[in-house]
Amino acid sequence: MGTETVSKPVMDNGSGDSDDDKPLAFKRNNTVASNSNQSKSNSQRSKAVPTTKVSPMRSPVTSPNGTTPSNKTSIVKSSMPSSSSKASPAKSPLRNDMPSTVKDRSQLQKDQSECKIEHEDSEDDRPLSSILSGNKGPTSSRQVSSPQPEKKNNGDRPLDRASRIIKDESDDETPISSMFRKKIDSGMSGGNQLSNDEKKPLVQKLHQNGSTVKNEVPNGKVLGKRPLEKNSSADQSSLKKAKISASPTSVKMKQDSVKKEIDDKGRVLVSPKMKAKQLSTREDGTDDDDDDDVPISKRFKSDSSNSNTSSAKPKAVKLNSTSSAAKPKARNVVSPRSRAMTKNTKKVTKDSKYSTSSKSSPSSGDGQKKWTTLVHNGVIFPPPYKPHGIKILYKGKPVDLTIEQEEVATMFAVMRETDYYTKPQFRENFWNDWRRLLGKKHVIQKLDDCDFTPIYEWHLEEKEKKKQMSTEEKKALKEEKMKQEEKYMWAVVDGVKEKIGNFRVEPPGLFRGRGEHPKMGKLKKRIHPCEITLNIGKGAPIPECPIAGERWKEVKHDNTVTWLAFWADPINPKEFKYVFLGAGSSLKGLSDKEKYEKARNLTDHIDNIRTTYTKNFTAKDVKMRQIAVATYLIDKLALRAGNEKDDDEADTVGCCTLKVGNVECIPPNKIKFDFLGKDSIQYVNTVEVEPLVYKAIGQFQAGKSKTDDLFDELDTSKLNAHLKELVPGLTAKVFRTYNASITLDEMLSQETKDGDVTQKIVVYQKANKEVAIICNHQRTVSKTHGAQIEKLTARIEELKEVLKELKTNLDRAKKGKPPLEGSDGKKIRSLEPNAWEKKIAQQSAKIEKMERDMHTKEDLKTVALGTSKINYLDPRITVAWCKRHEVPIEKIFTKSLLEKFAWAMDVEPEYRFSRR
């Protein structure tokens, strides 16, 4: 077999350490032959043997006389030292015009001997022949190639890449099996090469041609799975493309992608026919041992277990990849040989605040592919601030402000109508942020001396102008707004148009928070495109940045997640704001269904779980006792698990973060809970518990101060880890969904009686209220609640007066007397007693309904029914109940909920949440 040596590889732009820029067929020559083929390889060295194998493109090799050696067959003795040897085919179809004389071959041997010194690495004290012989097999090829057309060498004609590869089309009809037969045979012994390569110096490894992942993918399979193509991104040198599970549709897409690449770049990287043949190899089922039928999540798991890198670290992704969108299953696999080259890239990812954040950071998903193609237009930004020029007063004197200072002052002035305006914490945080904009030497030095009345009055005038607008003007404004937002409202997922949930970037303003949030009043700065990361499909057009002169922070192509965009929360940078598809999208519907199925599955295990934690109430291990008591409280009271809070976050509490002072033991076995729950809503509840639970809580409190943790041996992660041991996938949150749904299902089944639709709706609202109380879904009483109740009361009194008149007229009709005049002085037509009785019945029903509505409004004034409907109640329970009792679903679900739960509308009327 002929060999070729290179004096120095030609690098483009210093990217010589990248081997992914070479055609993939070139990398296949890196495969090491098996020991069983040693004798055959030796015999091939002694004489040239013609072959149909396609020769890879090479960098030009400069000989002493200034000519480029031919890649024709050369006779090279096995004892000849060479720093870079390459087993090449006997005849290359790329350069079929070169002479094959003995003189040329001897000249090539001379050139190879002279360039040996220039490629010596850290093993300078040893001849390469001894290293090669130590491997007990033919040496693997090592050669570096430039992806660009090569430069002239001493006046020689440049080895133009396109012209050479075009000549290769004559071999398009050659069967791939014959072209790559030797490669497949040699791939069987690739396992022994890994240990030898690990011992080689890094420089020597970098000069090798390609980085085959020998410990993960057999060489024979890689050859059959990867078509010849060019990756133009030099930054992806260390990332190997994984095997692609192709379907008949994807084969066509790949062929079209090849044609497009030829048209766009004006050069042929590979014959379309050849690429189609390589792809069809997979379709014909010739690769019996591939893993295309293995779920992608398992393949990710296998990759991470075979790699020395931590699976927790996200893999670097090059954003400007030219990969086609027709390759949905492409994965980045880092070979052992290329780990050193990816060190810097991984470090950047690790140090990023997004990857290291411990709270809601964008992850790589669960490894399951959520979509194949994704196209959207990004997000829409709020309009820029328009200055009004109104001055505020400081100690009675007008003060000039810059545009930035005026914008923030206006944010504060327009909140004069709210309670926040007078809250000390709100004013303090606002002043601290506004003072930074004003500067230390500004005339305004104290917030209390500022009078924002001029701006507030301007604000009221603007509101009044909007109210005075005609219907046509309002309609025109609305249409203009819709026209601007239309293109941002939709995404195309796998060819299906889906509505996006919230595509608007939040405008700047003053943070309010819920309850007594410690950050209320802080400035929410304006979000810019350079802070936003987008997620789209590979090959999809990158959304145009709507703000001139700016650009997106990053563009990802992660099909294991469903978010479309995210950015850091301006108030709490450890948290993120996401843009997802709408609630009615197929992806969201599937996610909801899986959530409720997981909770429903708990019905099969709940008895065993309760038996387990009851037994552990008396466990000797304190940690096990605390886990048992915490699980009991989460199960019986539907408490949230709770997470640790930073000092600058609202001091809300969950089960695992309860303090000793939040729990009071009341003999003989009652516990009073008093703490600030999620959204800073106070949770106050006194419940009767099991005697063993009462005793255990008393023991947990012993010797501790009120600010100490009640469960000092426990946190949320430990609790969830224990629950997952009992039931795979079980977390504390599943208990809330289970308890909410099972409560609704049982109450509706037990309390629904025959009656009209209105009465049945009252039964549903009562059950919904019970769920809301269990989940502590509270709300503050509306400011207009009192006025609404007064209005209803007055209306009921009016109806009762009318009822009295009707009853009086009924009595007069029975006596044959004419009816009395109405309260408005008008005469009333005489009617038969039956007609008066009918009017009385209608009026009584109207009064009864209004009284029922008023009672419900008063009863639910502090209870939020919507939260449990949206997040915790299996919608199939409601839909099935409505079908069984002939209640229109529109009476229970709003229009938005009907869209969100479209997947549940086909449920059978007999559906029950409990499978028992």
Swiss-Prot record:
GO biological process: DNA topological change
Domain Topo IB-type catalytic: 584-914
Region named Disordered: 1-369
PROSITE patterns reported for this sequence: TOPO_IB_1, TOPO_IB_2
Record's keyword annotation contains Cytoplasm: no
Entry-linked CDD domains: Topo_IB_C
Signal peptide range: none
Biased composition (Polar residues): 60-76, 130-148, 230-239
Biased composition (Acidic residues): 285-294
GO MF annotation terms: DNA binding; DNA topoisomerase type I (single strand cut, ATP-independent) activity
GO CC terms of this entry: chromosome; nucleus
Disruption phenotype: Defects in phyllotaxis and plant architecture. Morphological abnormalities of several organs. Defects in cellular development and organization of both the shoot and the root meristem.
Highest taxon of source: Eukaryota
Modification Phosphothreonine occurs at: 286
InterPro entries: DNA_brk_join_enz, DNA_topo_DNA_db_N_dom1, DNA_topo_DNA_db_N_dom2, TopoI, TopoI_C_dom, TopoI_cat_a-hlx-sub_euk, TopoI_cat_a/b-sub_euk, TopoI_cat_euk
Coiled-coil portions: 778-860
Localization annotation: Nucleus
Keywords assigned by UniProt, alphabetized: Coiled coil, DNA-binding, Isomerase, Nucleus, Phosphoprotein, Topoisomerase
Entry comment describing in which tissues the protein is expressed: Expressed in inflorescence meristems. Expressed in primordia of sepals, petals, stamens, carpels and ovules. Expressed in midstage embryos.
Entry similarity comment: Belongs to the type IB topoisomerase family.
Quaternary data: Interacts with DEK3.
Additional free-text comment from the UniProt record: Eukaryotic topoisomerase I and II can relax both negative and positive supercoils, whereas prokaryotic enzymes relax only negative supercoils.
Protein name listed in UniProt: DNA topoisomerase 1 alpha
Species for this entry: Arabidopsis thaliana (Mouse-ear cress)
